[in-house]
């Protein structure tokens, strides 16, 4: 199934470096404390992206990773930022080392493509955890650090700083997602291999196959490096997933691969201290990640919606000063700050809960004693007001999948999930309707309009939960026309035609422009196919959580039934308005 996608941004390299240099200069004027540390980490993440973009441009030009002069020049200030980050963290945010004077190096490409480091944005990967893990390594020889781009670029510089190693080498594995390889220029390869070195490979993961770590290890082993001289620094302590080959599994089992988890890095006492800056002394913290929040919304487990526990953001229910707050990971490297600005816009419009602020990657939002929303007559009213406000207030911060890409995703998922006959019906549907790309008005769409994402308060009002970042999630969709969310509400609440008409009208009025009906018709089967794929992947990955797998399989059945009915023309099963 096609579900995941990567986020990329192409920028003018010198302009980005100049802006980043100003940000670094501003850090020097900040007082000690967690906010200065946050700013250092934000600059560290941003400069890591720039180095990644330069390295990728060089690889594209030469067909192999070679460590261009521009990349090597930028690794020096990245190392200096790493040292400042370490000094700040180790001194409880009191001290920092000298900050670099950042300038554009010679040989810099005019434009570079920056990849979003997914671990920083989605999976609570903190660079300090890698520093702590690096200190647990037992090395036999001089350390040489290899960072796997994207996120491994900055992390490798940080680990090299911890180990007192020379500047790292960065690589971009290529090939089939489950069987990747790396290629280095002859000069870089010659400088890399030496018998007295202990190699440290840095990346997030491992994922389904562990192929990125494996690609680097295989390259080294093929050139005579012993396995016991190759260590890994991953983001979690688990094994590679079900697509890993036997060699990768054996290599992983025997390697040094220390991990420091977020819970170890951020014990409750440390998190409580940070939060006290926003909400006062903390009385209690309860972890409600992995779907545990459902116990506070639903009376019975039988009513719990499906979740994918390992993909949920870390979140805590916090009590302070007699009030309760939801503290949720929103991303480091400036991600949480950007989402805070969005939350304040939507709260001012009266459609989401109050957000108090952010503290080093966590948003602090007022916890509401609210219940689940049923299939009530007012769904078009509260959903239309919310979607219209979103369309009016939130232009897209980045791009999203084109209609052609959505159609290709849907075609594939339908073929895999429902068979060739229904896939052929979708192909005819696309030909008949066309893909009116020129009519798409991209906004920062919600992309999660499920039943359980809405909160009904005791006074009858309904607010939208989890409304801040799914347009930039680790999936294909991205920013879309508001018709995508309209389709989502119609599908998730199974709206009758008259209710769907009301939703369309209210959304258009609140947005200031009508909902495009042709787009709505085009996007509805695409929405269903995407959710079918996501539910199927969730069900397939939940072998260790059988009760969650049952819920995901029920979602698969629901989306498959709706999609099949829509495309094969079974009357009375699809409620889109005419």
Named regions from a protein language model:
Residues 396-447, 457-459, 552-572:
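An alpha-helical support segment within catalytic cores of ATP-dependent transferases
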Residues 297-429, 460, 467-529:
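Conserved ATP-binding subdomain of kinase catalytic cores across diverse folds
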């Amino acid at each position: 199934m096609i579900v995941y996608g990567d986020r990329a941004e192409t920028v003018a390299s010198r302009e980005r470096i100049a802006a980043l240099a100003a940000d670094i200069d501003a850090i020097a004027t900040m007082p000690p404390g967690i906010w200065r540390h946050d700013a250092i980490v934000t600059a560290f993440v941003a400069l890591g992206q720039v180095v990644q973009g330069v390295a990728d441009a060089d690889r594209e030009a030469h067909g192999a990773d070679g460590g261009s002069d521009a990349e090597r020049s930028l690794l020096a200030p990245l190392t200096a930022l790493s040292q400042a980050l370490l000094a700040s963290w180790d001194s409880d945010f009191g001290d920092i080392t000298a900050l670099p004077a950042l300038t554009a190096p010679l040989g810099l490409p005019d434009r570079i493509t920056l990849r979003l480091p997914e671990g920083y944005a989605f999976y609570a990967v903190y660079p300090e955890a890698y520093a702590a893990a690096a200190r647990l390594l037992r090395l036999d020889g001089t350390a040489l650090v290899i960072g796997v781009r994207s996120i491994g670029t900055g992390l490798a510089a940080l680990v090299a700083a911890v180990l007192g190693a020379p500047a790292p080498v960065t690589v971009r594995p290529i090939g089939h997602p489950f069987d990747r390889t790396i290629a280095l220029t002859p000069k870089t390869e010659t400088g890399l291999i030496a018998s007295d070195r202990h190699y440290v490979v840095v990346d997030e993961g491992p994922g389904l196959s562990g192929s990125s770590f494996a690609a680097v290890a295989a390259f080294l082993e093929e050139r005579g490096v012993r396995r016991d001289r190759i260590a890994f620094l991953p983001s979690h302590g688990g094994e590679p997933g079900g697509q890993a080959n036997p060699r990768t599994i054996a290599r992983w089992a025997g390697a040094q691969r220390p991990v420091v988890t977020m819970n170890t890095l951020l014990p409750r006492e440390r998190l409580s201290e940070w939060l006290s800056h926003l909400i006062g002394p903390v009385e209690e913290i309860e972890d409600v990640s992995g779907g545990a929040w459902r116990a506070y919304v639903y009376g019975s487990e039988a009513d719990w919606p499906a979740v994918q526990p390992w993909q949920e953001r870390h979140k805590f229910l916090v009590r302070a000063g007699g009030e309760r707050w939801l503290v949720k990971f929103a991303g480091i490297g400036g991600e949480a700050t950007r989402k805070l600005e969005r939350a304040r816009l939507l709260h001012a419009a009266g459609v989401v809960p109050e957000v108090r602020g952010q503290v080093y990657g966590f948003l602090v939002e007022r916890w509401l004693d609210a219940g689940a929303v049923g299939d009530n007559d007012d769904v078009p009213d509260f959903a239309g007001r919310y979607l219209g406000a979103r369309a009016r207030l939130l232009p897209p911060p980045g791009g999203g999948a084109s209609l052609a890409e959505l159609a290709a995703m849907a075609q594939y998922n339908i073929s895999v999930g429902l068979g060739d006959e229904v896939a052929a019906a979708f192909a005819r549907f696309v030909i008949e309707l066309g893909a009116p790309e020129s009519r798409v008005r991209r906004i920062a769409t919600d992309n999660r309009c499920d039943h359980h994402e809405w909160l009904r308060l005791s006074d009858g009002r309904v607010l939208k939960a989890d409304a801040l970042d799914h347009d930039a999630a680790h999936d294909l969709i991205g920013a879309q026309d508001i018709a995508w969310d309209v389709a989502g509400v119609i599908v998730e609440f199974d709206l009758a035609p008259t209710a769907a008409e009301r939703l369309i009208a209210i959304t258009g009025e609140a947005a200031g422009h009508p909902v495009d009906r042709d787009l709505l018709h085009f996007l509805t089967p695409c929405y269903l196919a995407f959710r079918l794929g996501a539910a199927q992947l969730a069900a397939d990955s939940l072998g260790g959580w059988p009760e969650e797998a049952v819920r995901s399989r029920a979602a698969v059945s629901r989306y498959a039934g709706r999609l099949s009915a829509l495309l094969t023309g079974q009357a009375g099963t699809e409620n889109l308005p005419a």
